[in-house]
Amino acid sequence: MANRGPSYGLSREVQEKIEQKYDADLENKLVDWIILQCAEDIEHPPPGRAHFQKWLMDGTVLCKLINSLYPPGQEPIPKISESKMAFKQMEQISQFLKAAEIYGVRTTDIFQTVDLWEGKDMAAVQRTLMALGSVAVTKDDGCYRGEPSWFHRKAQQNRRGFSEEQLRQGQNVIGLQMGSNKGASQAGMTGYGMPRQIM
């Protein structure tokens, strides 16, 4: 964490709860997918939250990832710099976040730059990468590389269109219980709060 000291009291409890949401198994799956998706010579980071953060912190891996989800020549981030300057790295992270939102990741699934840069909420980073993978699998445009079962396929809109004639025919259907004194009834039911009468 950049210029922040240790947190105490309620802040410490909140930070511990956030840290408990981090999933080490999910980290391994995401690292494998990113390396496979980018298809470049990206080194495999050592396991652990701190190493995962350091691996993604400069933004180059994230920018390569989002570029690999587009056809060649249509990459959203044309220039990726491997700079050691903090502002350049944070700028690349924010470029990735904007490109991920344009790609189809919901705003509620996107982490904030400080979550990754300061390591405040690495679970949010994992959620964003999972959402990005889900959108990539759902699009099924040939740019996704990896096992399709690694991510959930998002539900697609499936609108039904009914003609006026079909809607009129639906009004003529008699409900199954109309005109019947059998089936569901309210016999024997009492109002809320009333005692049951046993005689």
Curated annotation (Swiss-Prot):
UniProt Calponin-like repeat ranges: 174-199
Compositionally biased spans, kind Polar residues: 178-188
GO cellular component terms attached to this protein's record: actin cytoskeleton
Keyword set, alphabetical order: Phosphoprotein
Alphabetical list of Pfam families matching this protein: Calponin, CH
Location of region: Disordered: 178-199
GO BP terms, alphabetized: actin filament organization
GO molecular function: actin filament binding
Domain Calponin-homology (CH): 24-136
PTM-bearing positions, type Phosphoserine: S163
Highest taxon above the source species: Eukaryota
Entry's family note: Belongs to the calponin family.
Descriptive protein name: Transgelin-3
